[in-house]
Amino acid sequence: MKRASGVGHLVPFLPGLGSLLEDPEVSEIMINGPANVWVERAGKLEPHEAPGLTGAWLHRAAIHIARPLGLDPATRPVLDARLGDGSRVAICTPPAAPEVAITIRRFGGRAFSAEDLVRMGSLPEPVLEAARRTLLARRNVLVSGGTGSGKTTLLNALIELLPEDERIVAIEDTLELRIDRANCLRFEAGATHDTPVSIRDLVRHALRHRPDHIVVGEVRGAEAADLLQALNTGHGGSLTTVHANNAKSALSRLASCAMQAGDALPWEVTCRGVVDGIALVLHTTRREGRRFVEEALEVRGYDAAAGRWATAPVWGGAAELPEEAKTHTPKEVHA
């Protein structure tokens, strides 16, 4: 993906929003129109008054962002861009929207370690230890959750549990992970390449680069089949994420994605591949402005006759929790 200027370059084009663009507590700015601005600060949504922001200013901002990409909002009313500082911008202009709409997702200042997340109350200590054991045993972890639930933050923290002297190949649709490793090869998919490159293309290609561990930022489609094959053929200690409503549905979601492959195996066989490929599922959620691991399951098997996953709770749900954990109140993760 091509890059426009950093988020600081937008300040002159967005009157009344300069303080937000410079506030490290602000993770997302949502401009629905000149009189309808919302901001996510410390995990909570709140309205923001920007009296000087007009439709004309929003139009200028859209042009300023699009021009370095060789695009024109007049002919391309829906576009995505990554700014020079890693922040992401989504723009929608008329006629696709009543007014110019711009959403800015700021790139975080630093990555949180697993220990940081434990201290914040976002990652229970038993879950961290289960993840550590799983990865060091060269078994694989699936992180699930909804949009904005902290999946990427958790994934980034778990990567740091991998041995320092081993090679990581990370594959993302948009570069968001902050991986501080010398021997890490990063791939980015995208439709803006002259020759479009998909996540599935990159998962297949990654195997030629001798990875000890494969990290896929998010599985959405047929690439799940290739990833499961890799996980089941010697690339243990790998990680990925998937959108799902709970930990068990994450397993079904991963299997469903794998079934989208043109050469997909039967459902029962695919589910057995998920069982062989995934040892631990960590489900994240966001509630009342807080992001935290709500549930963790060990994957034990799949009952084809009943159509059910066999799992063992590690945290949440039916897990045996200490009394203090039952009243656990997680704090916010700003990422």
Predicted regions and their residues:
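Conserved P-loop NTPase
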Residues: 98, 273-335
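Active-site phosphate-binding and catalytic loops of NTP-dependent enzymes
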Residues: 12-19, 65-82, 166, 261-268
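Walker A (P-loop) phosphate-binding loop of P-loop NTPases
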Residues: 148
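Switch/coupling sub-region of P-loop NTPases
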Residues: 141, 157-277, 283-285
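Conserved lysine of the Walker
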Residues: 151
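The Walker A (P-loop) glycine that initiates the GxxxxGKT/S ATP-binding motif of P-loop NTPases
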Residues: 145
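N-terminal anchoring/assembly modules that precede and organize ATP-driven motor systems
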Residues: 1-47
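P-loop NTP-binding catalytic core
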Residues: 23, 40, 46-137
